[in-house]
């Protein structure tokens, strides 16, 4: 009878099933870790433990992996399925020798010497009973509740009290074939394997639990002794004519206002609540790119998460996802407006630290906040902040606020030893709870102050919100960024550490823009966003079902055959599947008659649906521009298309934070897909296929409102090339309001003053606002913009511009 069939092991498994709830990290080891099911596999664990192996056995059965109780049989040689680096620890006395497990490594390596085709995978497995990092200088508690090397008695207590928070983490497999071929098969290599594995387990534990937590008051007193805060206290006392004791008390108040008070116990309780909440709200949360972030943590990077900001749910979603992906929830910079009872204290114990909207004029607060942020980086706590500064009301990314990015970069310049890496995060939802409120605010209604009653009101309305999306974008390691942007930055800082470098502000602006671009590069396409994009481009926000499905299939083909970036995610399935999902979520409605089904967006939520369209509009705006060019320019050639894309892409890039490396190559690839899909026929020039005109018309509709804005700008500049930026912004906004009133344009971003400010800055950067030398370029771009408009819209713009200038 095998071990796993013995009465002892059956009894143990029965007890653990009652007491233990295990979470696997990553959730799909075969996909995330590239395990090869056709190759033999051996598990490597840090410490021999009957309960750990029993927990592992439950998970391997679920995942279809070999049981740890079944010995490995290869070439007539039998070896344990689990190799442990340390023996079990008795209640009294010394730990058992691990020498026998070193022999296992040697035996496995020697088998590879005999069989050149064999390749055994060594898979490190870490088990955690709870994830408490512990407190600094808390030696008594550590001795009582030691988790890394517990005796069997302590392990029983851990299972009893922490069994519902058991994590089994699989790591990337090590190929013994590679080790044998590259390094040999002797005892020295076996010892090296054991050393590397020990380091790996140590790092993995820190990724899972995080660094030890400081005692809050001890941290405050240490920070008050720092040079920067000491200096700020003296300056505060001198400027306000108060004593240094009073100034120091003020600094302590600021620290108490700012600092988090992280509690692992509260995080465990919150995990249960959030599991219930997500299961009630969403059918699932789609995650992409978590493994690369786990690896950065493992490699010792200081991680700063910089997500887009859609909803108050963002705070909860990221922390929850990271917790379940085997990483520590970050310390989150939250607006001081969220520090209301009872949410504020709970957020603080969940890792939130609070930040005022403005530091201007308050040097003491600035010094306190910067020193606290430096301390987080130095101690190794991951941090999260929203670079937009607030939630987007339109669904587009907002222009970044650079304050937190500047402070992060300053921390690097002051000598943070670990590599600091910004991780852009794209967050998407099939339903954003606040979206109706956003549009009320955009229409002029005063924003409500956050309170606990808003939270209760939102929870009361919980329903089927579809799915959530968390995509981790391309990381930006700040040392590498500085090396690329300012190769001599170390020398500049060394010469005068107190002097602000002249290159710092431009570098911060470049970095902030890159963060936003990387967020959009990781966009998640969904049934709601893509269906909104199609229907809002139609005349009455309605299409025949078959036509809608066909259009969605075209967009899916574009997004899959020409991926926007490797970080972008596109839904599986067909256009038919996406329509069904939209109907299920009640984002679209269906009407049936004798001729078939009509899918539409109800007029009452049409403006709301622009929010979801705007989440992904950047992914299809260039194909839309090309479609408009093919439809409205006679005998259009590839060169014509490329010229149009080159003229408008800089503005699209500034407005939508796009990161296409080579617009010409991208445009050519889109044209190739159009030809392959039969949308156009190429014979020296392009001819639109008669039966595909409607598909191109729908696609071109996506850029209509954007092109109308550009036409307003360039028609104004063509009439008055020497306009000041402020004048251009004012006049273009006024004309946009007139155009919207005459042609029924309701999209909130069409009237956004900040958007016209962004475009005017880009126009100045491109040289269109500097002098009269660019008049020929302005006229050319104006003519191209006008060509791409409907005649009625074009005439309204031309007439309005002429009337504006007469006034």
From Swiss-Prot:
Keywords: Acyltransferase, Cell inner membrane, Cell membrane, Lipid biosynthesis, Lipid metabolism, Membrane, Phospholipid biosynthesis, Phospholipid metabolism, Transferase
PANTHER family per the UniProt record, alphabetical: DIHYDROXYACETONE PHOSPHATE ACYLTRANSFERASE, GLYCEROL-3-PHOSPHATE ACYLTRANSFERASE
Protein source organism: Shewanella piezotolerans (strain WP3 / JCM 13877)
Reaction catalysis annotation: sn-glycerol 3-phosphate + an acyl-CoA = a 1-acyl-sn-glycero-3-phosphate + CoA
Localization of this protein: Cell inner membrane
Lineage, uppermost ranks: Bacteria, Pseudomonadati, Pseudomonadota, Gammaproteobacteria, Alteromonadales
Gene Ontology CC, one term: plasma membrane
Family the UniProt entry places it in: Belongs to the GPAT/DAPAT family.
Protein known as: Glycerol-3-phosphate acyltransferase
Ranges spanned by the short sequence motif HXXXXD motif, renumbered to the chain: 308-313
NCBIfam families hit by this protein: plsB, PRK04974.1
Pfam families registered for this protein in UniProt: Acyltransferase, GPAT_C
GO MF annotations in UniProt: glycerol-3-phosphate O-acyltransferase activity
Domain notes: The HXXXXD motif is essential for acyltransferase activity and may constitute the binding site for the phosphate moiety of the glycerol-3-phosphate.
Example of a GO biological process term: CDP-diacylglycerol biosynthetic process
Signal peptide: none
SMART domains hit by this protein: PlsC
E.C. number: 2.3.1.15
Enzyme class of the recorded protein, top EC level: transferase
Annotated membrane topology: Peripheral membrane protein
Pathway where it operates: Phospholipid metabolism; CDP-diacylglycerol biosynthesis; CDP-diacylglycerol from sn-glycerol 3-phosphate: step 1/3
SUPFAM superfamilies registered for this protein in UniProt: Glycerol-3-phosphate (1)-acyltransferase
Record HAMAP family: Glyc3P_acyltrans (MF_00393)
Superkingdom of origin organism: Bacteria
